[in-house]
Amino acid sequence: MKKVIFIFIMCFSFGSLIAQDVAALKNAGNDALKVKDFAKALENYEKVMAATGTAGPDYAMIYNSAVCAIQIKNYEKAAKYFDQTIAGNYKPEDSFFNKAMVLKLQKKNEEYIKVMNEGITKFPENPKFKTDLAKYYLMDGSVQYNNGATLLKSAIDKLKSKKYKDTKDPAYLADIEKVKKEFSDAIPSLDKSIELNPADATAKTIKSNCEKQLKTL
């Protein structure tokens, strides 16, 4: 009986020490976060997670871990921790949006679009999902439009300098086909931007320019 009591006391004491250590690590993480030592904060938070496992996850701390990971540009960890806060329904709107931002930083564009569309569906009253996705499509369309404009200028310059014989020169015609492709490919992205943000005059103007150029080529 005494042996059982002794073992119980030892286990209780050991558990108390672990709890104290975990609390100390979490406090150290919070202190580091306050002074913007994000690497140190994340290190301490991860020690807490390693010690506690999956028992009663501290979603506030996990969310802070994701934020710290963004600050030190460890985007894989940031996405992982935002996945956990999404699963725990902790700050769901911010967790979804920030995960999408992390994916965009990683240039995982298809995954970014997927998460943003999920956010639009789940949180229709939150405008930032539509706003950011509209900007993404606007940028995508703008890049293709600018590529087309640059290629067109180059083709015209070569024509003026007699590098191309005339507008029937096969090399000139090949360049014009590339120009047409860039302008044509820009339009679907611009349409999506306009659909998400109908008031965006810039997207409408660029789309109109694409259409005008395609008619003249």
Per-range role (PLM):
Residues 53-56, 90, 124-125, 198:
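Short coil turns that delineate tetratricopeptide repeat
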Residues 48, 84-85, 118-119, 193:
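Canonical positions in the second alpha-helix
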Residues 23, 57-60, 94, 128, ...:
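Start-of-helix register in tetratricopeptide repeats
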Residues 145-189:
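Short coil/linker segments at helix-helix boundaries
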Residues 60-64, 98, 132-135, 139, ...:
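Canonical tetratricopeptide repeat
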